[in-house]
Curated annotation (Swiss-Prot):
BP GO terms, sorted: bicellular tight junction assembly; cell-cell junction organization; negative regulation of epithelial cell migration; negative regulation of epithelial cell proliferation; negative regulation of JNK cascade; protein localization to cell junction; response to osmotic stress
Species lineage: Eukaryota, Metazoa, Chordata, Craniata, Vertebrata
Annotated organism of origin: Homo sapiens
Protein name (record): MARVEL domain-containing protein 3
Parts of the chain on the Cytoplasmic side: 1-226, 293-300, 382-401
Name of encoding gene: MARVELD3
Membrane topology: Multi-pass membrane protein
Length: 401
């Protein structure tokens, strides 16, 4: 501190050493443990630089301990290779720096002399079995033996195979792929068309036209004319009273003439009905075949043509039904039909009336259903054409007819 006058206080002087004091005898001496003193047998060190803590160790015991440690290390590496057989030898530089005690070997080449992508040279550890080369085909999977206690594949599970990539890499994984089971008839690429709406309409059109053809053929098959038992008439006459023995002489000849005249009245309309139904059946079968072969995909204008034809057919069924029943009603209302009916009723037969029978009515019903089915087919064909044009512009999408 400074006094008010500004004079600095003098610093305290150190205390002077006592000249009569005697120094301590162990002042400059380092204190060593008894075993660290010169001449102590426990002061000896082992070959690895660690001090021995007991006087019973010798170099042979140290060498045996080092050998046990190396064997334990080898067992650990063998366990690692068993867990991961595709893994190569471990590159432990601090472990493989030199040969083990009691072993002789050739040192590895320096890293500078190795190629960049080449395989590593032999090391002191045993190398794992090498994998297949990139140019070699992978080995096929081995079949499982009967006595193998491995996992059994359930019967419903599809057959599978395993594929190993050809390029060996650490941690390589097995790729497992499945083969699909045998597909059904409609699962193939082309037959899938039969499950679409257009194909169902086309097959229904085929069925309806076949039924119309069958109904029309009933009237066409009756060749007409009286047939006695000795002449063995057709099945139609046996069922509807054509084969009988009630007429003889003039009545039999008159019945034969009336049958031929009535048959000639119905023949034109029945023939036209059979021809039209047969032609439509063939046309619908052609459309189904083209759909299975995917012809409309390559030529979309065929879909437009199909749609127009379906609309024309659906519209043509209406006047066809009118003319069909008009001509049939004219034939059933003719004097020939009435005289024929009276002749057969006089002999007790009632199957020759002047009215529409079941085959004529069935043909009309199937034709009416055909109008609806063909109209629906025309709509689906136009929609299919629009979708094909859209897919032609965007081929990434997929559409099945």
């Amino acid at each position: 501190m400074e006094d008010p006058s500004g004079a600095r206080e003098p610093r305290a002087r150190p205390r002077e050493r006592d000249p009569g004091r005697r120094p301590h005898p162990d002042q400059g001496r380092t204190h060593d443990r008894p075993r660290d003193r010169p001449g102590d047998p426990r002061r000896k060190r082992s070959s690895d630089g660690n001090r021995r803590r007991d006087g019973d160790r010798d170099p042979e015991r140290d060498q045996e301990r080092d050998g046990n440690r190396d064997r334990n290390r080898d067992r650990e590496r063998e366990r690692e290779r068993e867990r991961d057989p595709d893994r190569g030898p471990r590159r432990d530089t601090h472990r493989d720096a030199g040969p083990r005690a009691g072993e002789h070997g050739v040192w590895e080449k320096p890293r500078q002399s190795r190629t960049r992508d080449g395989a590593r040279g032999l090391t002191w550890d045993a190398a794992a079995p090498p994998g297949p080369a990139p140019w070699e085909a992978p080995e096929p999977p081995q079949p499982q033996r009967k006595g193998d206690p491995g996992r059994r594949r359930p019967e419903s599970e599809p057959p599978s195979e395993r594929y190993l990539p050809s390029t060996p890499r650490p941690g390589r994984e097995e790729v497992e792929y499945y083969q699909s089971e045998a597909e059904g008839l409609l699962e193939c690429h082309k037959c899938k068309y039969l499950c679409t709406g257009r194909a169902c309409c086309q097959m229904l059109e085929v069925l309806l036209n076949l039924l119309i053809l069958a109904c029309s053929s009933v009237s066409y098959s009756s060749t007409g004319g009286y047939t006695g038992i000795t002449s063995l008439g057709g099945i139609y006459y046996y069922q509807f009273g054509g084969a009988y023995s009630g007429f003889d002489g003039a009545d039999g000849e008159k019945a034969q003439q009336l049958d031929v005249q009535f048959y000639q009245l119905k023949l034109p309309m029945v023939t036209v009905a059979m021809a039209c139904s047969g032609a439509l059946t063939a046309l619908c079968c052609l459309f189904v075949a083209m759909g299975v072969l995917r012809v409309p995909w390559h030529c979309p204008l065929l879909l437009v043509t199909e749609g127009l034809l379906d609309m024309l057919i659906a519209g043509g069924y209406i006047p066809a039904l009118y003319f069909y029943f008009h001509y049939l009603s004219a034939a059933y209302g003719s004097p020939v039909c009435k005289e024929r009916q009276a002749l057969y009723q006089s002999k007790g037969y009632s199957g020759f009336g002047c009215s529409f029978h079941g085959a004529d009515i069935g043909a009309g019903i199937f034709a009416a259903l055909g109008i609806v089915v063909f109209a629906l087919g025309a709509v689906l064909a136009i929609k299919g054409y629009r979708k094909v044009r859209k897919l032609k512009e965007k081929p990434a999408e997929m559409f099945e007819f």
